[in-house]
Regions:
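N-terminal secretory signal peptides that target proteins for export/translocation
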Residues: 1-14
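Cell-wall polysaccharide-cleaving catalytic domain and substrate-binding groove, primarily
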Residues: 38-162, 170-237
């Protein structure tokens, strides 16, 4: 499975602090100030920390890509262009029936740019976000959930009996964030390391699991090739 996002470099204590700060902000003030159904609002809380820190939850965001192994990145979760995730997202919009019209607009713009992420694609991405901001955010969230979060959650239960759906929002957001950061397979590798160190880790409280998960993630992102990224990239989680 392709990686979604650029790989940041940040030491484990910083990763933990950022996670806790964003979770506290979420609990105190909320992250998304938008009108949704109750079910959508509950679902959007999962992944809100990742989106808040990556882009302030803005579906229109396009990064410059400077100094980033992921290249120019798009949307609330910063889909990495060098891994063709924006194109894969557009195709998913069509194939899943989530919004074929938006998916086709993005693919047409990509082709107009000569199968690259150029001016046409950027303009189309921003215009969709301007016209349908909430809907576009929901599509991006739905793509991450279907392609990365849900498969990770399923495998965690199958392999370790860890029922993430029955655990706290803190743990759900941590799993989402690491699946976004490392891909589903990479996130599962982090949990494999936790299991190797402590086969009974599932019985631990959620905060301890989150702490250990971010420590393992920090060890991964501090190894090449990601350790060669520019400082501006290193600040991302």
């Amino acid at each position: 499975m392709k990686k979604i996002l650029k790989k940041p470099i940040v030491h484990a204590p910083v990763l933990r602090r950022l996670c806790y700060v964003m979770l506290a902000a979420l609990m105190i003030t909320g992250v998304f100030v938008i009108h949704t159904s109750a079910a959508e609002a509950d679902d959007l809380l999962i992944g809100s920390v990742s989106a808040k820190y990556e882009s302030n939850g803005n579906p229109a965001t396009i990064s410059t890509g400077a100094g980033d192994t992921g290249g120019k990145s798009y949307g609330a979760y910063q889909f990495a262009s060098s891994y063709d995730v924006p194109y894969t997202f557009a195709q998913w919009c069509i194939d899943s029936g989530s919004d074929a019209a938006i998916g086709q607009q993005l693919i047409n713009a990509y082709r107009a740019d000569g199968n690259t992420y150029g001016a046409q694609f950027d303009s189309t991405w921003r215009s969709i976000a301007a016209a349908q901001s909430q809907h576009f955010l929901w599509l991006q969230h739905g793509y991450i959930k279907a392609q990365y979060y849900d498969p990770t959650v399923s495998q965690l239960y199958s392999r370790y009996g860890l029922n993430v759906n029955a655990r706290s929002l803190t743990l759900k957001n941590a799993v989402w964030s690491r699946a976004v950061q490392h891909g589903s397979g990479g996130c599962l590798n982090l949990f494999a390391a936790l299991y190797a160190a402590d086969p009974s880790f599932v019985s631990l409280d959620d905060l301890t699991i989150v702490t250990r998960l971010y420590e393992e993630s920090g060890a991964v992102v501090n190894t090449p090739p990601y350790s060669n990224s520019q400082p501006i990239v290193k600040a991302n989680v």
